A protein has these predicted regions:
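Conserved N-terminal helix/loop that builds the PLP phosphate-binding region
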Residues: 1-64
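PLP-dependent enzyme catalytic core of the Aspartate aminotransferase-like
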Residues: 2-3, 8-14, 58-60, 64, ...
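Conserved C-terminal alpha-helix-loop-beta "cap" of PLP-dependent enzymes
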Residues: 15-26, 275-276, 280-281, 350-393
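Conserved core of the PLP fold type I
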Residues: 66-212, 223-245, 360
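Conserved core segment of the aminotransferase class I/II
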Residues: 98, 239-320
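Conserved glycine-rich beta-strand-loop-beta hairpin in the small C-terminal domain of fold type I
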Residues: 313-327, 339-354
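Single conserved hydrophobic/aromatic residue that forms the stacking wall/gate
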Residues: 406-426
Length: 426
């Protein structure tokens, strides 16, 4: 029965039962972490053989005859460029292979734009009277942290199952020259798990920005992170942008952080020829080369993009049961109460849960006191301010399958808060 249909007496009885369950959870002294999309130990163990690919007897000369131990090749070795180019569906000349973190590449891209501008800028963003960024919400907290760090004004754009509200995006981008960029996680978005529709990608590619130096930050973090056999597919934005003469408008990012070792993987930028030249010129003042040994290690381990895609099946075998378990428990224990809604993603690392308005912070607090750490309520919005206080991001990847069940079962005890709120309304 939906809670809103219960009498005051039924609500009281249900609340008391929830409190009892919650107290039982607290007494177990659980210490469970669902706060970040971290690979679990089993996933990390999968990549251990990669550490044996190179040793002191290995040839560290790449296919072009480059000794990867030495300086040089700022934008990465050819073999790594080809692997990522095949993965993202672009030409290898469009790839800059960076260090271990795509987040660093994104931060540096904003920093360069603020200090020097981007290709096509008449002046640095930092010398403009105002700089604005569009932020699809709910979204990735670390994206918002970057733009907040640089004092960039962030504007919420609601997400839909097809992607950001493109009517709003077009209105703002095409008419406000202060709008310099937008954050996008186009495939299995964080946290909703939505993949942008073909129409959405085409509308992005066809934007007519009022700012000549507007950029789409296309964070394709989950491009191969499928959970289902009938997985989503994403239209290639560069192919569409070229049709509109807009290929300079896009910065695409990807990494192996959730493929091999987070913090010890390989990250890339994909961009137009003009952007690659502009970025490389500035990057050359900052760096001589990234870790080419690690680039070679990854290439030899996977062989090619198809080898990497096949490897992702192993991740799916570990992650899919955890996601299925969380969805099953939410459905069994909360499905009839009409107080939570959630998505069932086909890939990515998160499940987005929405409470009734005004309840997310309290739910997160109760979870924390019960030993379950969630991403902070509000974190999926700029400035950590969820206007409706309703969105919670669940990250099932890190706990074991058994603990994933424990994590989610605790949510059953949390409607006591909602019971109380509904009873007060009555």
């Amino acid at each position: 029965m939906a809670l809103k249909d219960m009498t005051a007496e039924q609500l009281k009885a249900f609340r008391d039962e929830c409190r009892k369950q919650y107290d039982d959870f607290k007494s177990q002294g659980l210490k469970l972490d669902m706060s970040r999309g971290k690979p679990c130990k089993e996933q990390l163990d999968m990549s251990m053989p990669m550490l044996d690919v190179l040793n002191s007897s290995s040839s560290l000369i790449d296919a072009d005859g480059v000794d990867v131990r030495n300086y040089g090749f700022l934008t990465g070795i050819t073999e790594a460029k080809k692997l990522f180019a095949d993965l993202l569906g672009v030409d290898p000349s469009m790839i800059i292979v960076g260090g271990n973190s795509s987040l660093t590449l994104m931060y540096d891209s904003v920093a360069r734009a603020m200090q020097f501008g981007v290709y096509g800028s008449t002046k640095p963003w930092g010398k403009c009277d105002k700089v604005k960024f569009l932020c699809p919400v709910p979204g990735y907290d670390r994206h918002f942290g970057i733009t907040e760090t640089f004092g960039i004004e962030m504007i919420n754009v609601p997400m839909t199952p097809q992607g950001p509200d493109m009517d709003m995006v077009e209105e703002l981008v095409n008419n406000d020259p202060a709008v310099k960029g937008i954050w996008c996680v186009p495939m299995y978005s964080n946290p909703d798990g939505y993949t942008y529709s073909d129409e959405t990608v085409k509308r992005f590619a066809a934007l007519k920005p009022a700012a000549e130096d507007f950029r789409i930050f296309w964070d394709n973090a989950y491009c191969v992170h499928h959970l289902k056999d009938d997985h989503d597919s994403l239209l290639n934005i560069f192919d569409e942008a070229k049709k509109c003469g807009n290929e300079d408008m896009i910065f695409e990012f990807a990494s192996t952080s959730k493929i091999t070792f987070p913090g010890a993987g390989v990250a890339v930028i994909a961009a137009s020829e003009n952007n690659v030249k502009h970025i490389s010129k500035l990057l050359g003042m900052q760096n001589i080369s990234y870790d080419k040994v690690n680039q070679l290690r990854h290439v030899r381990y996977f062989g090619n993009a198809d080898g990497l895609r096949k490897y992702m099946e192993k991740h799916k075998a570990i992650l899919a049961p955890k996601f299925d378990t969380v969805i099953r428990i939410l459905t069994e224990q909360m499905g009839d109460l009409d107080i939570l809604t959630w998505n069932e993603p086909k890939g990515g690392y998160f499940i987005s849960v929405n409470t009734l308005d005004g309840c997310a912070k309290e739910v997160a607090r109760l979870c924390k006191e019960g030993g379950v750490v969630l991403t902070g309520a509000g974190a999926t919005f700029p400035y950590k301010k969820d206007p409706n206080d309703k969105n919670i991001r669940l990250s099932p990847s890190f706990p074991t399958l058994e603990r994933s069940e424990e994590h989610t079962s605790e949510l059953q005890s949390l409607p006591n808060l909602v019971c109380r709120l509904l009873r007060e309304k009555k």
